[in-house]
Amino acid sequence: MSNLRLQKRLASAVLKCGKHRVWLDPNEVSEISGANSRQSIRRLVNDGLIIRKPVTVHSRFRAREYEEARRKGRHTGYGKRRGTANARMPEKTLWIRRMRVLRNLLRRYRDAKKLDKHLYHELYLRAKGNNFKNKKNLIEYIFKKKTENKRAKQLADQAQARRDKNKESRKRREERQVVKRAELLRKISQSEKVIAGK
């Protein structure tokens, strides 16, 4: 059998594929070995003596199946783990994810006028200080804080109303005393006049 390395190389260039994908008809070796130009190779391709083999199928079925199982949590036991917990799921990534969730919630509440800017800023700094484990935790804290603020405001209003009432009553008492004193002085002066007239 003659060496068909040249023909294979030319055929791969003509067919625009790798040399492994070129098939040369083993029954027509003598005719193929005579072809030493691209033109003659093209003729042999048209005659069907040289064929471009189809791409070998490399199925991803098993890989997809395995990936699907991993999504469900299979194949992730202690024996399958190579890196540290921090390498597999970095703490920084978890922190960034949590901060984004909490800050988006705070921003949304502030824009919806559920939080004033002072409470927003306080909660923002608390979130940064790792005060809230998750979104639910933050919502509960906001609800509690708003209730406390509302109660404090009510108590402050009640205290102010009481102070105003006491102030008003004190003022009225003083006015009454002034009137009474004036009345008393008038009576005394009248009685003195009467005594002086006798």
UniProtKB/Swiss-Prot annotation:
Gene Ontology cellular-component terms listed: cytosolic large ribosomal subunit
Compositional bias annotation for Basic and acidic residues: 160-177
GO molecular function, one term: structural constituent of ribosome
Signal sequence bounds: none
Disordered: region residues: 66-85, 150-177
Sorted UniProt keywords: Ribonucleoprotein, Ribosomal protein
GO BP term, example: determination of adult lifespan
Bias type Basic residues, positions: 71-83
HAMAP family: Ribosomal_eL19 (MF_01475)
Top-level taxon in the UniProt lineage: Eukaryota
Classification via PROSITE patterns: RIBOSOMAL_L19E (PS00526)
One Pfam family, short name: Ribosomal_L19e
SMART domains per UniProt: Ribosomal_L19e
The family this protein is said to belong to: Belongs to the eukaryotic ribosomal protein eL19 family.
Protein name: Large ribosomal subunit protein eL19
